[in-house]
Amino acid sequence: MRRINIILYFILISVGILAQNSKKIKGAGNNINAYIGTWVYQSNDTIFKIVFQKGKKISPYGETHGLYGGYYLSVKGEVLEDYMGPLPTCWNLEISTTHPDNMYIWAPNSDSYDKSTVPALGMSFYDKRKKHFNGEGISGGYIKLLSPKKLLWHLDEKKGIWWEVEGREDTDITKVLPIGFSVPEYAILTKEE
């Protein structure tokens, strides 16, 4: 009888351990360090800047590491957008599902890349003037390091709309019209020293 109790005890302990919600950590590593800093695009009288810093997003399923970013836009010497202030270091979805007010770009790192290479990163962009999907941001864009000093910035609104509404029964994708962006959709930026 004692042996049966010991066996049952170990079975219950094992089941309890296996039933624990193990949180996964995704995207951790230093392969995105090359993105950190301020990047500038200038064309005629337009200046567009973005800044990136490392951060993470915590959810009930785990934590995802990536880049938080801010942006700045001036045209003909007039500042139209200036969201380069302090950025968050953590977005905890267990506390609030609403994205932080000072988060304008979120580019999560992925585990599917070799950690020794710098990956292209998909991103969500929170356009403070156009407010896609009521300010919830729009995916479909990406950033890609072309060289240590050159960065490709690309926003694809049609793809972002598709990702947001595809499969939703409450929204007809043909009725969601593009509204554009307040910043350049495609630009090659240079890293500031």
Name each region found by the language model.
Residues 1, 32, 155-156:
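Intrinsically disordered, low-complexity regions enriched in Ser/Pro/Gly/Gln/His and often acidic
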Residues 36, 47, 66-68, 150, ...:
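Extracellular structured ligand-interaction cores
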Residues 40-42, 144:
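Well-ordered beta-strand positions
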Residues 41, 69, 152-155:
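Short hydrophobic/aromatic-rich beta-strand segments that constitute the beta-sheet cores
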